[in-house]
Design a protein with these regions (language model features):
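NAD(P)+-binding Rossmann beta1-loop-alpha1 motif at the extreme N-terminus of oxidoreductases
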Residues: 1-36, 40-43, 50, 179-180
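Internal alpha-helical scaffold of NAD(P)-dependent oxidoreductase catalytic cores
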Residues: 92-102, 118-155, 168-205
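Rossmann-like NAD(P)(H) cofactor-binding subdomain of soluble oxidoreductases
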Residues: 27-28, 37, 45-121, 125
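NAD(P)-dependent Rossmann-like dehydrogenase/reductase catalytic/cofactor-binding core
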Residues: 193-254
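Hydrophobic residues within alpha-helices
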Residues: 5-6, 71, 174
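Small-residue helix-packing motif on alpha-helices
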Residues: 20, 30, 48, 184-191, ...
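A short glycine-threonine-serine/GTX helix/turn-capping micro-motif
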Residues: 156-165, 186, 214
């Protein structure tokens, strides 16, 4: 995810390579990122905390406590802290860093890797509107971003953050069905991906309810409604809702 954020910032001209300083767990990763993006790198998280205007904590929630232990004494009260770690609340981050800090949380998703991400962003009361707009501009560099209250961020993380995995499972199954019906594997993947992409664009462009768009495809007595009935009988909706429920529950335990 950090690479997607770096790529978006550079592509949209939000920052120059020399204005970005990054760290990683391994020297190999540092070398690869430096070579690809031309950014500055450091083996010290503390150094980055001391120098940053916006300190981006682009680590998994299980790693965040260890990173904070390294940077706590280097964080300044005038810098923005932007965390993408799921489940770690603003209050948790403030307490862990031991100060009255400006904290923003951002929940992006993997489509950010191709500039089509979807991010929910929230802040504490110390972050000004101008500072929040800087963070929103950053988030928009790799997709859509919307400010939300923190109480919704776990739901957003499940609906937009985890859902690409669910969509890919659906696409894989759809492609397998196409192969079973005689399509080549490459054909099945291509047609499936385009169908999902086009459907998403249609929903965004028209603003229509997904149920209405579904009904537009289902002709009376036609083939599609037969498939819809099969999905209903197998509990598609309930399965999807349950998947989101358990994702939210797990996030709150992190």
């Amino acid at each position: 995810m950090a690479r997607a954020m770096i790529g978006g910032m550079l592509e949209k001209g939000i920052a120059k390579p020399e204005e970005i300083l990054g760290s990683a767990k391994t020297q190999a990763t540092l070398d690869a990122v430096s070579e690809k993006y031309g950014i500055c790198v450091s083996g010290s998280n503390r150094e980055i905390a001391e120098k940053a205007d916006i300190l981006i904590l682009a680590v998994k929630p299980q790693m965040l406590a260890g990173v904070i232990e390294e940077i706590r004494d280097g964080v300044r009260q005038d810098e923005l802290i932007l965390s993408i770690a799921a489940g770690k609340t603003i209050a948790w981050i403030e307490e862990a860093l031991g100060g009255n800090l400006k904290v923003v949380r951002c929940m992006p998703n993997t489509p950010a890797m191709v500039g089509e991400g979807c991010s929910g962003v929230c802040r504490n009361e110390r972050v000004s509107d101008e500072e929040m707009e800087r963070c929103m501009t950053l988030a928009r560099s790799f997709g859509m971003a919307q400010e939300i209250p923190e109480k919704l961020i776990d739901a957003v993380g499940a609906v937009s953050g985890s859902s690409p995995a669910f969509v890919f499972m659906f696409m894989e199954a759809l492609a397998d069905a196409g192969v079973k019906a005689g399509m080549t594997r490459s054909q099945a993947y291509r047609f499936t991906a385009q169908a999902v992409l086009g459907s998403a664009k249609l929903m965004l462009a028209t603003g229509k309810h997904p149920g209405e768009l579904k009904d537009m495809v289902c002709s009376p007595g036609g083939t599609t409604i037969e498939g819809v009935q099969a999905l209903e009988e197998m509990g598609l909706r309930a399965s999807v809702m349950k998947a989101v429920d358990v994702c939210v529950e797990k996030t709150r335990k992190l």
